[in-house]
């Protein structure tokens, strides 16, 4: 694996590590520090994608690894937010439904890449989540003026958190609906105009298959060739040992 590919995957790994430490950090340091950690994790989500495309090191492993990190981070983040406001339960439920829908699409051999709505959702979530954490611990944000702190503190908690998380909840719902639409109406313009190629699975022995899997999952050229294929079930078969 070349250095650039390592860097991209390490950035994704940082997000997973950040996810694991969110709850203990919140219990020890409160919302301000968790908000900062969340912001760093959201930035790695953007940076690793930008670098992967710029350096042309996108792979199927990276795409799945990144997707797993995103979902894990989002759900754990909202679980921590649930300790602050019950409104956080709504996006948790929607995220679980999105995962189920994506699994169904995958089982039907449909493309499970994030669409435009899903990509926009990430940034709306980032803003809402970070601001909610910071607002919950605003007394400990020392660089803010007393006027700003008093203004925020005078807003009832339910109203404040609904204002901050409302757009994120709306984007979660729109993303879910868009994926449901794609599941029932998969023949969109892209598929109609670009017929997907067939990923052929050669007959290999166990050792050869291991090498082939490595080349498939970690090969940027293979990813670029097949990233828009709808027949991803063939790729899934390559990951099986039997």
Language-model features: locations:
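Structural signal for membrane-spanning alpha-helices in multi-pass inner-membrane proteins
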Residues: 19-26, 77-81, 102-106, 129-136, ...
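Small-residue-rich segments of transmembrane alpha-helices in multi-pass membrane proteins
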Residues: 20, 65-78, 118-133
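C-terminal membrane-associated helical module and adjoining short loops/tails
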Residues: 1-7, 35-38, 42, 110-242
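C-terminal ends of transmembrane helices
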Residues: 49-54, 102-112
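Mobile beta-alpha loop/short-helix "lid" or hinge segments that flank ligand
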Residues: 94-99, 136-140
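Active-site-adjacent helix/loop segment of glycosyltransferases
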Residues: 97-101, 121-124
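Membrane-embedded alpha-helical segments that form the functional core of polytopic membrane enzymes
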Residues: 3, 10-64, 77-96, 155-174
């Amino acid at each position: 694996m070349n250095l650039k590919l390592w860097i991209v995957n390490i950035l994704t790994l940082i997000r997973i590590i950040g996810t694991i430490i969110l709850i203990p950090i919140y219990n020890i340091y409160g919302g301000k520090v968790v908000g900062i950690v969340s912001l760093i994790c959201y930035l790695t989500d953007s940076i690793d994608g930008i670098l992967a495309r710029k350096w042309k090191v996108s792979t199927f492993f990276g795409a799945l690894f990144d997707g797993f990190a995103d979902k894990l981070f989002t759900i754990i983040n909202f679980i921590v937010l649930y300790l602050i406001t019950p409104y956080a339960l709504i996006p948790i439920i929607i995220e679980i439904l999105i995962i189920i829908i994506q699994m169904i699409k995958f089982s039907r051999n449909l493309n499970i890449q994030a669409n435009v709505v899903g990509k926009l959702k990430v940034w709306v979530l980032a803003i809402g989540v970070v601001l909610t954490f910071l607002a919950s611990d605003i007394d400990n944000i020392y660089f803010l003026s007393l006027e700003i702190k008093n203004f925020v503190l005078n807003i009832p908690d339910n109203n404040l958190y609904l204002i901050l998380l409302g757009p994120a909840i709306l984007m979660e719902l729109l993303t879910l609906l868009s994926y449901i639409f794609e599941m029932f109406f998969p023949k969109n313009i892209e598929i109609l105009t670009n017929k997907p190629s067939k990923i052929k699975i050669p007959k290999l022995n166990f050792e050869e298959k291991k090498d082939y899997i490595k080349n498939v999952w970690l090969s940027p050229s293979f990813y670029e060739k097949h990233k828009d294929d709808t027949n991803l079930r063939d790729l899934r078969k390559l990951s099986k040992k039997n």
